[in-house]
Each structure stands twice: as C-alpha cells, then as structure tokens.
A protein has these predicted regions:
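A glycine-rich beta-strand to alpha-helix segment
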Residues: 118-149, 154
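Structural beta-sheet core signal
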Residues: 51-53, 80, 135
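Short, solvent-exposed amphipathic alpha-helical segments in soluble enzyme
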Residues: 39-42, 66-70, 94-96, 129, ...
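C-terminal helical cap/extension that packs against the catalytic core
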Residues: 69-129
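Hydrophobic, well-ordered secondary-structure elements that form the walls
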Residues: 26, 78, 133
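Nucleotide phosphate-binding/pyrophosphate-handling subdomain across enzymes
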Residues: 4-74
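Short amphipathic alpha-helical segments
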Residues: 36, 63-65, 91-92, 124, ...
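Short glycine-rich anion-binding loops that position phosphate/pyrophosphate groups of nucleotides
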Residues: 55-58, 83-86, 138-141
C-alpha cells in the first residue's frame, strides 16, 4: 500500500478515449523528471506523443527555461498551459508563452492554451489512433485527463 501511495501521479494511467488513445498523468515539475517521462514514453509503442505541461512556479520556470524546452522537445505535440504559481507572485517577468517561445527557438513547435476544457477539446479533435497523451505538472493540469477519457466524452 505504501508503494502504491508513493507512486501516485507518476506515469499514472488515467484511461483511454476514441478507443485506443491512452492518457497518463504525472506530477513531474523539473526538467530531469520530464526527460525521464519522455524516455519512458518513447519506449512505448505509440503513434504520436502529446504532452500538456503546466510549469510549476515562476522562479523555477525562469531559472530552468531552456532546460524545460530541451526536456519537452522529444514530444510530437506540446501544449503549454499557465504557470501554476503555488505561493509565488510573478515578480520574475515570466509567462507560459516564454516557454513556448523557447521551445520554438530550439526548432520544435509548441502551443499555449490556458483553458483546460479547450485543451481537452483540441486534443480530442486532433489525436489519432495509438497516440499517447500525458498531462504533466504539480498543479491543476491533472484535471485534464479525466476530461479526455471515454466515460467523460461529449
């Protein structure tokens, strides 16, 4: 029981939608954790890998911006949502769009979306057979997975 509790939100299977598109959720909020998720995902049989990433804290996002971009680069489809502030105020002059721009600088495509319902709809409209979708971050991004899975489809 302790092992299961300690593994909560670590590559946790949420469910499927459109028959065979798998959704996973992970608490990762540091570039090394995201790189580990990318490595694990690339070892799974899949078509395209999607990641919805919610950066955790303005300070971490500012300090590790390039590292986050490199860690997210292996994913085929990258969606960045608003920074989860935790207890911080944005005194760092940083936004989620800055991360999208940094990802673009290294030659990858990413999009910024703030509304979770719109993110879920976008993924449902664009994901195809055998894709893998990951929701990643220490904040509220975990709410998106249940919006995607079959028992929550429109």
């Amino acid at each position: 029981m302790c092992i299961r509790d300690s593994a909560h939100r670590r590559y946790e299977f949420v469910g499927t939608f459109h028959g065979n598109i798998s959704v996973f959720d992970d608490y990762a909020h540091h570039p090394t954790e995201i790189q580990a998720i990318a490595n694990a995902t690339m070892q799974k049989k899949h078509n395209k890998a999607w990641i919805v990433f919610q950066p955790h804290t303005y300070s971490r996002t500012k300090n590790l911006l390039h590292d986050f971009a490199k860690a997210l680069a292996p994913f085929d489809n990258i969606i960045i949502t608003d920074i989860y502030a935790a207890r911080e105020k944005n005194t760092f002059d940083i936004s989620a769009q800055d991360l999208v721009d940094e990802i673009t600088k290294i030659g990858r495509k990413a999009i910024y979306m703030s509304n979770f319902e719109e993110i879920a709809k976008y993924i449902k409209d664009h994901a195809i057979n055998n894709d893998i979708v990951l929701t990643v971050g220490a904040g509220t991004v975990t709410k998106i997975g249940p919006m995607l899975v079959d028992n929550h489809e429109d």
